[in-house]
Structures are given as structure tokens and as C-alpha cells.
Design a protein with these regions (language model features):
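A conserved beta-turn-beta hairpin within the catalytic core of GNAT-like acetyltransferases
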Residues: 68-80, 90
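Conserved GNAT acetyl-CoA-binding A-motif
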Residues: 106-118
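A short helix-loop-beta-strand connector motif used in the catalytic cores of GNAT acetyltransferases and
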Residues: 40-52, 79
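Conserved beta-strand in the GNAT
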Residues: 52, 58-67, 79
Length: 152
């Protein structure tokens, strides 16, 4: 399998959202439109990186790196916000290449750590640990999403 990992371009956004739709069923069409809008912004932001793996023209993988400052870490923290790979042969190779590029990009941007949110699947934890990630406790999240106000 011959593919290339590179920074995403605006012209890739439609193919990226199509890949996300095929690989992760939790997104509905309205959410995918919001994802596309956000990706269009992230392509240009210095505190993010949107990377794609392309095989000829099709996008076969995507990874999103987001940066945030951290006083506790005394620097920037990189977060692997999203990784999606076309299922099938070569998926592990594509995911590995995307992850290596995310690590390189995070280092180049001055990150002290790279974090990834884990699912509850112990097998997934083991896969990340094989790649060099270490368990670092749990996080609590408070949603700041706005909810629509209903009128009576």
C-alpha cells in the first residue's frame, strides 16, 4: 500500500468528513456539518494540526492534534483529538504513520506531553500502552455546550 501523510488542505475537508461518517457511526449529518466547519478553521490555526493519509486521491486516514497550555505541565499539552482510518488492509500501517506524524508535529510545536482520551475497552488501553502511552489517571469533564431554550 502506497500512501502519503501530509497536512490537510481545505479541499480535503469533504473527504475527511466522509471518512469520519464511514468509520464512526455516532455522528449525524448535522454534527458532521459542524465538524467540517471546525476542520476548515483548524487547518489554519497554529495551535492545531489536521493530518491526512492519502492514497492517490482518496483520504484513507485523518488525525487531529489540538494544543493547550498547561501550567501543571510547564508548557503545551498536545491532545490527539481524533483519529480515523479506512477499515481494511493497511489500516494499522496508516494509523501508525498518522500517529508518528502527530508525535513529530507535537514535538515541533513544543509540546511537553501528548494525551489521548481512552474508551472503556481494556484492549484499546493495551494498544495505546504498546505505542508508549502511559495511564495518567482519569479526567472529569463539565460540558459547556449550549442547550436550546424552549418556549412555552
Amino acid at each position: 500500500m502506497e500512501f502519503q501523510v501530509r497536512d490537510a488542505r481545505l479541499t480535503d475537508i469533504e473527504r475527511i468528513t466522509a471518512l469520519i461518517e464511514r468509520t464512526d457511526t455516532r455522528w449525524d449529518s448535522a454534527e458532521l456539518n459542524q465538524v467540517a466547519d471546525l476542520l476548515r478553521q483548524l487547518v489554519y490555526l497554529p495551535n492545531a494540526a489536521v493530518l491526512v493519509a492519502v492514497e492517490n486521491k482518496p483520504v484513507v486516514g485523518v488525525a487531529v492534534l489540538a494544543l493547550r497550555p498547561s501550567v501543571a505541565a510547564n508548557g503545551l499539552i498536545g491532545a490527539l483529538d481524533l483519529i480515523a482510518v479506512e477499515p481494511g488492509s493497511g489500516a494499522d500501517e496508516i494509523a501508525g504513520a498518522l500517529l508518528r506524524e502527530v508525535v513529530r508535529s507535537a514535538r515541533n510545536k513544543g509540546c511537553r506531553e501528548l494525551e489521548v482520551a481512552l474508551a472503556d475497552d481494556p484492549a484499546e488501553h493495551a494498544q495505546w500502552q504498546k505505542l508508549g502511552f502511559k495511564a495518567a489517571g482519569q479526567r472529569l469533564i463539565y460540558s459547556l455546550a449550549r442547550t436550546p431554550v424552549t418556549t412555552r
